[in-house]
A protein has these predicted regions:
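Short glycine/proline- and charge-enriched loop/turn segments
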Residues: 307-315
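Metal-cofactor-binding active-site regions of metalloenzymes
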Residues: 1-288, 340-342, 346-358, 362-464
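Short, basic/hydrophobic alpha-helical segments
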Residues: 331-337
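Hard-cation-handling environments
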Residues: 298, 303
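A short acidic, glycine-rich active-site loop
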Residues: 267, 316-322
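C-terminal amphipathic alpha-helical interaction region
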Residues: 292-294
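Divalent-cation-assisted or electrostatically stabilized phosphate/pyrophosphate-binding catalytic cores
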Residues: 324-328
């Protein structure tokens, strides 16, 4: 029997151990997509206890706790922090096979030096030990980031945000660069009930009137310039349903006007406006050399009752299922036709799309950019051991694993950075298996460089 989560955790071969311990383990982290709060980084917040740092905004954990039958008061409600922690402890003890189990114990090991498994029997001991450390200066938010050697992190920000935290952090002596990501979903999804109110908010931020789809593009261009000033290197889009139907500017303007006047829109009209906006934004991204991330197939807010009670991003989303390959290909080609396609990262929440995305990425290449269109890492419901192995196998079979930009946290927790370690161990194990099966030569120096690139260097070259 192997020891529990020791130094060689997930590393099944000697080659895997060499690649991880001599290459991947030492690399810094470029976390190019997360949902961390920049205000908490600026304030260098000190977390009060394990409950606050673990359960403060993590819907992965909330879903698992609901599956265990705990009341919402113990999950997102006003129950005592220690009672919430005990509920989470019982959840984790029962979470065999779930990545939450591994992530939780990697966090205990890497941040707190705790190797004892979390259980109801050890809960009080671990609570006291971890909380005592959380009160020391080494456990402020910034030090949690530096603990894991994070060189860059990209938060997720609305075009109307003032980015005061990012700008203030640039003036401080903080070794990690905290960069904004441009996420204009509220400008794209005109079917949402609050779209008219958002138009007013964005217009105020941009200092210009928005009375048409073309005006919307100009306002977003203005805000993108500001984001670039604040260090932005990447955008992000959540695409749901029909997101591209070719149309003229006049047709997109008509759809916008109809929506602002309270008219009902067809699925085709939604696709026309979204496609017009997205292709124009893509051209702007290309002009300014920033990457475009496309997160596709999240089916959001399925429990309307809980959405009304708790709002969005609280654990009631799932995978969607619809065909979108022709639409995606046409969308990318629209920009590629006049050589204005930006660097693009493709993600689908449904792993059934993996081969399609891997093959789609290979359609659009450019000199001097390694894998200009990337098949993105296993995302959300797929960023577990088997999901990562599947994504890596599909990418290597259809595309080029060596040019892959690697892992991200996609997290709201400042303890989430060991997820990069989790990915790197799985990566090294996969490559190690190929070598020891005789499928690739044991050129360890070359392979170590490849692992270092996938772990960190490729992301630096791609985004900076």
């Amino acid at each position: 029997m192997k020891p529990f989560m020791d130094a060689d955790f997930l590393l099944q071969t000697d080659t895997a151990k060499t690649l991880y311990h001599e290459a991947a383990e030492k690399m810094p982290i470029f976390d190019y997509h997360n949902h961390l709060n920049p205000q908490e980084i600026l304030e260098d917040r000190q977390m009060e206890n394990l409950t606050r740092v673990w359960l403060g905004g993590d819907h992965y954990k909330w879903r698992a706790m609901r599956a265990m039958g705990f009341s919402e008061d113990l999950i997102t409600g006003n129950a005592d922090d220690y009672d919430k922690y005990l509920a989470f402890t019982e959840t984790i003890e029962n979470a065999i096979g779930n990545p939450l189990y591994h992530w939780t114990h990697l966090e205990l090991q890497r941040y707190f030096g705790i190797t004892t498994p979390l259980s109801r029997a050890t809960a009080k001991e671990l609570w006291d030990e971890a909380n005592a450390k959380l009160q020391t200066k080494e456990f402020t938010v910034r030090n949690l980031i530096l603990n894991q050697h994070v060189s860059h992190l990209c938060t997720t920000d609305d075009p109307a945000d003032d980015l005061h935290c990012h700008l203030a952090l640039q003036k401080e002596d903080f070794a990690c660069r905290v960069l904004p990501s441009f996420r204009p979903d509220r400008a794209v999804h005109l079917e949402k009930p609050d779209f008219p109110e958002y138009v007013e908010k964005l217009a105020a931020a941009a200092g210009r009137t928005i009375a048409s789809a073309e005006d919307m593009v100009h306002a977003l261009s203005c805000r993108l310039d500001f984001f670039l000033y604040a260090g932005c290197v990447v955008s992000d889009h959540s695409l749901e349903g029909c997101f591209y139907v070719p149309c003229t500017a006049a047709e997109a303007n008509d759809v916008f006007e109809n929506r602002m006047n309270g008219g009902a829109l067809t699925e085709k009209e939604l696709g026309m406006y979204k496609g017009f906006l997205l292709t124009n934004l893509g051209r702007l991204y290309h002009k300014h050399n920033i990457a475009m991330q496309l997160h596709i197939k999240a089916l959001r807010n399925n429990s309307k009752r809980m959405f009304r009670a708790l709002g969005a991003d609280t654990g009631f989303d799932s995978m969607n299922d619809f065909a979108f390959a022709p639409m995606l290909g046409a969308f990318l080609n629209d920009m590629d036709e006049d050589d204005a396609l930006p660097k693009t990262v493709l993600y689908s929440l449904n792993p059934g799309d993996n081969p399609m995305l891997a093959s789609m990425a290979g359609n659009f290449a450019a000199p001097s950019i390694r894998s200009k269109v990337q098949f993105g890492t296993a995302w959300w419901f797929n960023d577990h051991k088997y999901g990562m192995e599947s994504q890596l196998a599909t990418l290597s079979s259809i595309g080029m694993l060596s040019t892959f930009i690697g892992m991200l946290t996609d997290s709201r927790s400042f303890l989430s950075f060991p997820r990069h370690e989790y990915f790197r161990r799985i990566l090294c194990n996969q490559i190690g298996n190929w070598v020891e099966n005789g499928e690739y030569p044991a050129n360890l120096e070359f392979l170590k460089e490849m692992v270092e690139n996938i772990s960190y260097n490729n992301a630096v070259s791609y985004f900076l």
